[in-house]
Amino acid sequence: VVAIFFVGWILMYATRTIFNPVMGVIGEQFGLSNTQLGLANSIFFLTYAVAQIPFGMIGDKIGRKLVIAVGFIVLAISTYFSGLATTFVMFLVIRAIAGIGQGAYYGPQYALSTEAIPASKRTIGNAIINSGMAFGTSGGYLLSSKLVLENGEHWSKPFFIMAIPTFIVGILFYTILKEKVIRPGEEAARAAAEEGPQEKISLKEIFSNRNLLAAFILCFTSIYANFVIITWLPQFLIAERGFTGASVGFISSLVPWASIPGALIFARLNDKTGATKKLVFTLV
């Protein structure tokens, strides 16, 4: 489970960041301003964010692995068709659909990984899964900058390439993943929990939970800053610092690579000490 979800996050972020190094090239082809280029990213993240709650609810009802698999297939197809777009409006619509496909992954993935990973190793397990984001960000940067900026290939080629492994992994998700994984020694506890009264939690209770609200705010501020950097850093290096070719992808990749050691070290520390609140406070 950890391995396949790790690969999933690699592809999730690679299919996003292949766009960033070639923003200028696409802008020249369609005659776009930086504002319009920003819109292409914004529409993707808007549909990605909006889709997460509905897909989480659907996953709870019909099965998480089905939602993840279908989402990845949609992502693969929309990534491929992104490279076929002949107008900016068409590109926007396709990227919006790609965002919807990615929105199907986030909630169901964490639900399944939480079920599958033992509690004593849950933080480090999720940290390993999440480190796929850094690998994917770096891979997307390097692929686009190497093929398009250095080799002079058409900007669509990275989209065509990334669609293939994304489609394959979508199929693997459906064939490999299992719902409600029961680990050895936990059968009795799981059976007792399922026999007892099942408490239903409403969305109102979720959004009124103080700890969850604090987590929402913390995630929003940190993720916002992170995505501003990974979205515009390649374009900044090209336009303002004069970098060319694969060096754009390499330098941009330093940001995600730097996050991996810290994530794994502090995740392991949290599993050992259980001092989640103190660690979060210290890091913030």
Give the location of each predicted region:
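Cytoplasmic helix-loop-helix junction between adjacent transmembrane helices
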Residues: 94-135
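Helix-loop-helix hairpin linking two adjacent transmembrane segments in secondary transporters
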Residues: 129-179
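Conserved MFS/SLC helix-loop-helix module at the cytosolic interface between two early adjacent transmembrane helices
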Residues: 50-87
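Juxtamembrane intracellular "pre-TM" segments in multi-pass secondary transporters
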Residues: 182-215
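Cytoplasmic membrane-interface "Motif A"-like loop-to-helix N-cap segments
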Residues: 61-71, 271-284
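Extracytoplasmic gate region of multi-pass secondary transporters
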Residues: 19-20, 210-263
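Residue-level signature of mid-helix packing/kink "hotspots" within the transmembrane helices
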Residues: 17, 45-53, 137-138, 256-264
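Helix-breaking motifs and short loop linkers at transmembrane-helix boundaries and internal kinks
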Residues: 31, 63, 84-90, 152, ...
